Amino acid sequence: MPAFVNERRVGPVTILELAPRLTHAEGSELHHVVSGLLDSGSQAVLLDCSRVTFIDSLGIGGLMRTWLSVGKRGKLKLFGLPPYFRQVLQITGLLKVMDSFDDVGLALRSFEP
């Protein structure tokens, strides 16, 4: 299954709508796609997590690897976390380091200087 089901741009921000499952394969693809976006000059990536219904430890690892690879090259943020996904990210401590928003509008505005 692909890591995301839709890609769109809103101004300088690329929004990737994640697929319902985030496992090793999807996490690896997500890392590859986000790296490609950064290589092509995009500096703002927003992950729409509203469809995610399952994430395993390898999916968490892929998400973390993606976030770490963005580093100083750009910004990666999340929005629309379902309760299950939010709880997983809280337990793992990732919500302390990753910016997340409930609303796409707030998330998009957070990229403004």
Tell me what each language-model feature is.
Residues 1-17:
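Short beta-strand/loop segment at the start of cytosolic alpha/beta domains
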